[in-house]
């Protein structure tokens, strides 16, 4: 069997084959590596996810439909009720603890100046008050409060009329909003719209009942006092009370005022309904610390010690609060931007509404309440009014006293000769007051014309007349005049030396 021997390739053919292979390798497409393929897919996926996030944020967060007013009201009422119940439970625990402590430290008076009534401690009980006023809490029908609505409507109408006369209320609100601490990213706030409404609140369904725990239990109480009576009434207001403001949102990064975004807001109260609770909190005085020790130093030390340990005096106050089932409907209009503007953004309305509810809850919704200190109801002379003549005399009493004192000083400087003023002239009428005013105007005109010298401060009329060369001689006192001179006593009389 013959063997085949491979013939070797020629050098020229080998070189051509190498050139062809090199050319094929250069022009063939480069295959994609796994690393480059995964980077491209990740980049595209990231861009798509960012776009989806922006889309959902704008659609559901900014332009999403807010829940209905009924749903929001129910949710807020449930939250407030839970807070009220928790507060009442804590008040009961605190009262039980304070009662156990104060039983052994109760103060006992050595004697009583005013005879006590049926109750040996504190005021009358709720049952006694209701029995003596013939009021049955369970059987008494609620009152309509029509008379109270008329009085409140007159007061509100007068306040609205005073506010519409000038723009003082706009300036006051602008000053209040810009005062105090304000974030740096909020610019100057300007009030550009205000509407006080045309309707009036209607109070109805008034009933009297014992006050609940926590309503009258304030910082000045010890928890051992008896219960109080409270009056509850329904309040309903359907009106449009609007306040509109303009401001700017400032972007202070990376440098101050890098960007400024104009914002215009208008908040309107559309409806308010709730239950108002009123209660009187009587005054409380510290216990008496009088002793029979004749030593003043010992008495001073006892009074100092007792004043440091006794509770402070609490005046009589009127407390009011709203129950947690109230409803407050707001309407918020917004305009954000300068060129491309966003109008009535729902999320901005929700944020403002939540802030308004929180502000009101922190001040006048149970368990929190407002206290107004009542003035003394004891009849006083300076508070007495009535009758046209009496009103004029009361308003001019202070002025008359000053005029009488000035006349007495002038007479003393004139040589010590005093003239008694008749009692009927100590309180001049309105006509005499107008005559005195005309006389003062005439004297001012003479001073401006140069006929009369102006009185220097600290000099009386008598001294000024002496400088002018005029000398006055006191008139004798007769029996009929009884020391009264018509030159000085007549109302509206001109001063001596007026005409030369």
Swiss-Prot record:
It is found in: Endoplasmic reticulum membrane. Disulfide bonds: none annotated. GO terms for cellular component: endoplasmic reticulum; endoplasmic reticulum membrane; ERMES complex. Pfam families: MMM1 (PF10296). Signal peptide: none annotated. Residues 141-375 form the SMP-LTD domain. The SMP-LTD domain is a barrel-like domain that can bind various types of glycerophospholipids in its interior and mediate their transfer between two adjacent bilayers. Homodimer. Component of the ER-mitochondria encounter structure (ERMES) or MDM complex, composed of MMM1, MDM10, MDM12 and MDM34. A MMM1 homodimer associates with one molecule of MDM12 on each side in a pairwise head-to-tail manner, and the SMP-LTD domains of MMM1 and MDM12 generate a continuous hydrophobic tunnel for phospholipid trafficking. Component of the ERMES/MDM complex, which serves as a molecular tether to connect the endoplasmic reticulum (ER) and mitochondria. Components of this complex are involved in the control of mitochondrial shape and protein biogenesis, and function in nonvesicular lipid trafficking between the ER and mitochondria. The MDM12-MMM1 subcomplex functions in the major beta-barrel assembly pathway that is responsible for biogenesis of all outer membrane beta-barrel proteins, and acts in a late step after the SAM complex. This is Maintenance of mitochondrial morphology protein 1. It comes from Phaeosphaeria nodorum (strain SN15 / ATCC MYA-4574 / FGSC 10173) (Glume blotch fungus). The gene is MMM1.
